[in-house]
A protein has these predicted regions:
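Phosphate/dinucleotide-binding and metal-coordinating scaffold of catalytic cores
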Residues: 1-151
Length: 151
């Protein structure tokens, strides 16, 4: 698998200037307020971030990520699809989720709140979602449990 970096973003999206967040446990997308620092320090460890900004590190800006998480946690009503599609490429999420389920990927957002990226694509103004680190798929079991049945 290719390394997810600015070169990869340029190849896939034709733009590499947006914020790329590497999301690892416990990146559960739960809204904990509008303070950016709260999302930077979920793990209470300044060396490790659940939402790790992998590009534009000097700006260290999490405001759009906080906006996304806030919208994801709105009460579901008739307007929810409109709200969410203004900030998230829903199709990219659904495709990734479908592949995760089809391959039995249990080490993902659904089960471990882990191993995904969010890219704030400046060309579209929406976040892209994609899975990474798919070594635990197709029934791979490292703790003597049938994780492929968990999805």
């Amino acid at each position: 698998m290719e390394e997810i970096d600015k070169e990869w973003l340029e190849d896939v999206y034709n733009v590499d200037t947006g914020n790329l967040y590497k999301c690892t446990y416990p990146a559960d997308l739960n809204y904990i307020g509008d303070n950016q620092e709260a999302y930077k320090n979920i793990m209470n460890n300044p060396e490790t971030r659940a939402y790790d900004l992998s590009t534009n590190e000097t700006e260290d800006n999490y405001s759009r990520l906080v906006d996304l998480i806030g919208i994801l946690n709105l009460p579901v009503n008739a307007n929810y699809p409109t709200y969410i599609s203004t900030i998230l490429n829903v199709e990219s999420v659904l495709k990734s989720f479908a592949i995760d389920v089809a391959t039995g990927n249990w080490d993902d957002y659904f089960y471990n709140k882990n191993n995904y990226y969010l890219y704030d694509n400046p060309a579209t103004g929406r976040f892209e979602y994609f899975t990474f680190d798919t070594d635990n798929t197709f029934g791979v079991d490292w703790v003597n449990r049938d994780w492929a049945q968990r999805n």
